[in-house]
C-alpha cells in the first residue's frame, strides 16, 4: 500500500507484485502516517496539532527541547472508517501519543507517550498504555519508565514485547557486572505478562543489540534485526525453548527484513556485504 496526492487529500493505492498492477483502493483519505487494522476494516492515522505560536521579543522555554522548532507540536491518533469516510479522534492531551501496535482482534491499540524529566538522566519518561476502541478507556501497562522505547502485542494479546535500555524495569536487563551504568545503545527486549506484570529480560545474556521486527502469529517466534559487531544479522527467539537462532541469509548486513505474518517460511529482505550492496532477496 502507498498514498498519492489526490484531488483533495490523498488516494490510497494497492500494488499487486504478482500482476504488477496498481489500483486506487480509497480516495480522499487523511494525510499522514497510517496503519491498517488486522481485518482491514479501519485505519489508524497519526496527524499532529501545531503547538502554541509565540510572538514578540520574548519566548518562555517550557523545557530544553522547546528551543527546537515545532517542539510544541503533538501527534494524536485518529480512527478512519473507509466505508463511511468518517474520522474519529481517539487521543487528546498535552503529550504526543504514538501507535505501537494493534491487537490481533482489532479491538485494542497499544500506544506510548513521553514527557520531559529535566532533573534526571535520560531526561524523559515513557508510558505504554492500552486503548479499548469500544469504550475509549485507557489502561496503563508501563508507567513512566525512563528507559523503555516501544512495545508490541504477542499473537494472543496476553503478553507484550517491550524494547528498551538494559536499565528498563529497574535495571532487570543489566549485564555489566559491578559497573553502575549500562550501555543504553545496547537495546534489549523484555516479555511482559499483562496479567501478572512479570518481566522476563530475554536478551540479557544475548550479546547483539536488538531491533524488534515481528512476533509471528503462526510459529510463535519473535524476529529481531541485530547489531552483531560489524554485522546486521536476523535472529529469531523461540519462547518455548528460550533460545535464539540466526537465520542463514545471503548477506552479512541486512538493512530490511519482512516476514509473512501467516507463513513464516516466506520472507523478503535487502542486504549487502563485502562484494555487494542493496541486494534484494525472497
Language-model region placement:
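Short loop/turn segments that connect beta-strands within beta-propeller blades
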Residues: 16-20, 81-85, 132-136, 193-197, ...
Amino acid at each position: 500500500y502507498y498514498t498519492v496526492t489526490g484531488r483533495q487529500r490523498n488516494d490510497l493505492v494497492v500494488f499487486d507484485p504478482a500482476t504488477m498492477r496498481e489500483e486506487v483502493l480509497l480516495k480522499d483519505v487523511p494525510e499522514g502516517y497510517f496503519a491498517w487494522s488486522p481485518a482491514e476494516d479501519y485505519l489508524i492515522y497519526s496527524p499532529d496539532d501545531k503547538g502554541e505560536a509565540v510572538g514578540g521579543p520574548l519566548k518562555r522555554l517550557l523545557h530544553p527541547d522547546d528551543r527546537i522548532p515545532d517542539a510544541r507540536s503533538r501527534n494524536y491518533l485518529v480512527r478512519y472508517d473507509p466505508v463511511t469516510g468518517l474520522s474519529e479522534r481517539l487521543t487528546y492531551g498535552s503529550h504526543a501519543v504514538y501507535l505501537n501496535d494493534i491487537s490481533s482482534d482489532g479491538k485494542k491499540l497499544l500506544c506510548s507517550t513521553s514527557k520531559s524529566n529535566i532533573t534526571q538522566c535520560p531526561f524523559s519518561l515513557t508510558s505504554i498504555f492500552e486503548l479499548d476502541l469500544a469504550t475509549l478507556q485507557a489502561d496503563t501497562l508501563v508507567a513512566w519508565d525512563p528507559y523503555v522505547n516501544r512495545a508490541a502485542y504477542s499473537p494472543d494479546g496476553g503478553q507484550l514485547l517491550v524494547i528498551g535500555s538494559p536499565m528498563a524495569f529497574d535495571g532487570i536487563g543489566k549485564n555489566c557486572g559491578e559497573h553502575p551504568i549500562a550501555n543504553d545503545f545496547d537495546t534489549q527486549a523484555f516479555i511482559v505478562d499483562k496479567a501478572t506484570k512479570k518481566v522476563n529480560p530475554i536478551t540479557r545474556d544475548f550479546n547483539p543489540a536488538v531491533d524488534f521486527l515481528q512476533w509471528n502469529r503462526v510459529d510463535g517466534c519473535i524476529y529481531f534485526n541485530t547489531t552483531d559487531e560489524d554485522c546486521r544479522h536476523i535472529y529469531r527467539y523461540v519462547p518455548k525453548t528460550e533460545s535464539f537462532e540466526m537465520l542463514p541469509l545471503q548477506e552479512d548486513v541486512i538493512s530490511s527484513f519482512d516476514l509473512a505474518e501467516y507463513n513464516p517460511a516466506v520472507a523478503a529482505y535487502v542486504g549487502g556485504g563485502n562484494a555487494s550492496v542493496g541486494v534484494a532477496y525472497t
